[in-house]
Regions:
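Active-site proximal loop and beta-alpha junction motif in alpha/beta enzyme cores
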Residues: 1-77, 83-317
Length: 317
């Protein structure tokens, strides 16, 4: 723990980068035991990015715990944040073996990593996929996404909310051109998320025929920003969706997901889903984080006591 109780080291990273200026920015706050949820949200608002707190784990089988924050709430899971934290801790010599077990609000997750030259590649395992039975129709979705007609949404694939850790509404579009032109009504989009119990919309389209490469955009529910440049949780849900409704083949299905291009932050994620006997049994996302800088950060004020460890029920869906 740092000598000054109000100072923490923050390591700034970018994750899933696919070119200059790409990836999802992710600050990692070290030695974050004792920070309360409000401080986590304030730090995320300060950095305007999902912010990760590294904390001690309660479970003996976990090496450490992670808490994930956006400006308006704490999240149950953040894949790119997990990749960032593992990369930072590995660079500090605090992770020496793979896999590593990490405690989160959702429970323990397993993360594998491998070293290539000076960088590590990280794979975050997620959970079996759950497909919602209650979903909006094409007209509802077209309206909140700013589409002038529902026919721009594919009719041969369903609109369905999928969770491999957090619910994301998967929306199949006819083309990348349609995807790039989306202009959502965000208040209406968030209200739709409320009605159907999902945490964001993830519209996607195939980049080219015959290849498992897709472009996607993520519009989260009341996160404190309108769009996300690279979303591991959503990409994992999309992989499960594609394996279930498009590929329809047993075994591991692998997909490349391109995201962030309309934001000027090109990103590339590799998401996989294990299909077996008509269900998606396992899912995972692979990517890299680049360490950009580190700073000593003054913590926001804290006038209330709350444990800084992951606690069930602490997150908002």
């Amino acid at each position: 723990m740092p000598g000054n109780a109000n100072i923490r080291t923050v390591v700034h990273t970018t994750v899933f980068s696919d070119g200059v200026g790409g990836g999802n920015p992710c600050p990692v706050v070290l030695d974050a035991d004792g920070l309360v949820s409000e401080q986590g949200m304030q730090l995320a608002a300060r950095f305007m990015a999902e912010t990760i707190l590294v904390v001690s784990a309660k479970a003996s089988e976990a090496s450490f715990g992670l808490r994930y924050f956006v400006p308006r709430h704490e999240m149950e899971m953040c894949v790119h944040g997990t990749i960032a934290a593992v990369t930072v801790l590995h660079s500090l010599g605090e992770i020496a073996t793979s896999p590593v077990r990490i405690e989160t609000v959702l429970g323990l997750i397993s993360v594998e990593w491998s070293r290539q030259n000076e960088q590590i590649t990280v794979t975050v395992s997620q959970f079996a996929a759950e497909f919602s039975k209650r979903n909006p129709d094409a007209a509802e979705v077209a309206q909140v996404l700013g589409l002038y007609e529902a026919s721009l949404i594919r009719a041969d694939l369903p609109i369905v909310s999928v969770s491999t850790s957090r619910q994301k509404l998967i929306v199949p579009l006819q083309s990348v051109q349609t995807l790039d032109c989306l202009r959502p009504n965000y208040e209406a989009l968030w209200s739709l998320c409320d009605r159907y119990g999902t945490t964001g919309l993830y519209p996607f389209a195939p980049v080219s025929k015959g290849e498992d490469i897709y472009a996607a955009r993520q519009f989260p529910k009341r996160a404190g920003y309108e769009e996300d440049p690279a979303t591991g949780v959503a990409a994992c849900a999309l992989a499960a969706y594609l394996a279930q409704y498009h590929s329809k083949k047993d075994g591991w299905n692998s997909f490349e997901i391109l995201q962030g291009r309309t934001m000027g932050r090109p990103s590339r994620l590799v998401a996989q889903a294990l299909a077996q006997d008509g269900s998606i049994r396992e899912t995972k996302v692979t990517g890299k984080a680049e360490i950009l800088s580190r700073e000593s950060c003054q913590l926001p004020s804290n006038n209330a006591f709350e444990s800084g460890r992951p606690q069930a029920g602490a997150a908002q869906r």
